[in-house]
Amino acid sequence: MKYKIVLDAGHGGSDSGNIGNGITEKEYSLLISNYIKERLDALGIENIVTRNTDRFLSDDDRVNIISSAFGNESNVIVLSNHLRNEDGEGLEVVYALRN
């Protein structure tokens, strides 16, 4: 099965996310998303990003971008972190183990 990956950098635009040491979560998530995209491109793995600049996306915007790119395909992986929790600390990585 060939995977298609959506890199969904959380936050953006007017939504900064959390701030630590003067750097916003939206900045980190965009940097990480763009880095992963470069690596996936180099490996020939099909992918899209929901945003590649500092702009706000609603949840509906994110869903529409994904649907426009891949429709209802079941082999899409979405990497995202835009939870609305102001008490969070640290880094979150979510992944699926599959056979």
Across the structure, where does each feature detected by a protein language model lie?
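Catalytic-core environment of secreted peptidases
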Residues: 1-21
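Glycine- and acidic-residue-enriched helix-capping/strand-helix junction motifs
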Residues: 17-31
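Active-site-proximal helix/loop segments of hydrolytic enzymes
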Residues: 2-4, 27-99
